[in-house]
Amino acid sequence: MTILASISSIGNIKSSSKSNIASSSSSSSSQSLNSIQCCSCSLALGNTVGNLVGGVLFGTGVIVGSVLNTVGNITTPILHPDCGCN
């Protein structure tokens, strides 16, 4: 009887730790989702302008798109500090 009770309590500890892990991973995934949503505008702008320029000069368009993406990644956390883009 004692062996069954100890096995039962070990099972409860394992299920408790699993629920803690699940709740912590879900909060981190929502944090990363938040950062993706916050950063998407600056990235989309850089890609769009880069693609427009790339229609005229392919090499220059790629460079301009990369520069604008970098600038967007730097300015977004400054302009929107509540976003997770840092």
Swiss-Prot record:
Pfam families: Coiled. It comes from the Eukaryota. Residues 11-33 are annotated as: Disordered. Signal peptide: none annotated. InterPro entries: HssA/B-related. Belongs to the hssA/B family. This is HssA/B-like protein 60. The lineage of its organism: Eukaryota, Amoebozoa, Evosea, Eumycetozoa, Dictyostelia.
